[in-house]
Amino acid sequence: MIGMNALGSNGRLGNQMFQYASLVGIAKNLGYDYCIPDHSKVTWFDRMEGDEIITQHHQLQHLFEMNNLGDRFGLIEGGNEIHLEQAEFCKELFDECPHNSTLYGYFESYHYFENAEEELRKDFVIRDHILSAAEKFHKDNKTDHPACISVRRG
């Protein structure tokens, strides 16, 4: 079993999705099971420290169906802590990650999870209440010239 005990404390949603996807892909490559912390009961995700917003909990269970995840919740206790510092794909980690390890890092390469596309597509299905709210917003704010702005913080 491998896990990501700190999922949610190392980046916001995009990073969390990459981290989870990488965990699934690495586990699949090595034939391991995997787990993530259960944050289903969390009602807040960030805290302020001075001028900084610190992310504490992952949002995946709140935003996505996570159909493939099942009940794979938990923490890796007393195992290896693997801190990935590099941005590029680490083939050694992908092929030789030790059993009973928790992963920490950004995992900024699709190569970690290109083998798990089917599983991840089942997990990353947006929850109905979010889709409904988005559809209502678009219906209520219909315009001939829609625009989208993405604000990157950090």
Indicate where each model-derived feature is located.
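Extracellular/lumenal mucin-like low-complexity stalks
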Residues: 1-6
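Short His-Asn-centered micro-motif
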Residues: 7, 37-38, 150-151
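A short, glycine/small-residue-rich beta-strand->loop->alpha-helix junction that serves as a flexible
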Residues: 8-18
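Histidine-anchored nucleotide/phosphate-binding helix
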Residues: 16-28
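Structural alpha-beta junctions
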Residues: 25-34, 69-70
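A short beta-strand-loop structural module common to alpha/beta enzyme folds
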Residues: 32-43
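Secretory-pathway luminal glycosyltransferase catalytic domains
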Residues: 43-154
